[in-house]
């Protein structure tokens, strides 16, 4: 970034069109892509969520006519076509692109941090900012998530009230627990009050003194909610096929979105 005459701040609170123009300078000066990616539809789904555009509305698939989805696929195609982003199918190559400096950045959930930090020699070279937002889409933001976890109480539980109370009083409200989990297990909470704790406010040497954990929790509180119903895997698989056809075969975006919707609806009705 610095080699291109830019700073980390130039990539904060930006739009995809602005990001792409700046990224071109980074690519030109460093001869590496600005972004590394893996999983095809993953970053498209992140873009979609950043605009709060649910792929399911009132229990029905809502891909056709979803302007945020179309804009996301168009943006993805531009990133690939202009060599601003490389998308790996091999996970090891994806991680290596970060560790070996053959990509300037990545848009991913905070769980990727442990893989980035495995390259200790890169300490001080990384920073964390919010993602670009989609241009011209109502409700677009600079925030999304990827991955996460769910807590559940089994129907076989003999004391569900106690189990629910345990989850509520620990993961649901204990800042002290999260303060212990962060340094000892590397688990980052999206529980908003955790951002006010001393542990979450500690600066990270690896990220140039940035209070990354506080920033991540702050970002998490701004992520729009979207609905996948029970069909996240079906939606993601269908979108991966659509994106592949658009990027590799020059297929029409609207037609591929229609095919994706038909595929998901077929799987739901099976």
Functional labels for PLM-detected ranges:
Residues 43-46, 70-165:
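Extracytoplasmic/periplasmic substrate-binding proteins
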Residues 48-51, 94, 170:
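Hydrophobic aliphatic residues
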Residues 112-123, 134-238:
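C-terminal lobe and pocket-closing loops
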Residues 255-256, 263, 267:
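Histidine-centered catalytic/metal-binding microenvironments
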Residues 3, 234, 238-249:
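Solvent-exposed, amphipathic alpha-helical segments
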Residues 1-42, 54-90, 155-161, 165, ...:
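Helix-loop-helix "hinge/cap" segment bordering the ligand-binding cleft or interdomain interface
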Residues 74, 78, 237-241, 262:
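Generic structural signal for well-ordered, non-membrane alpha-helices
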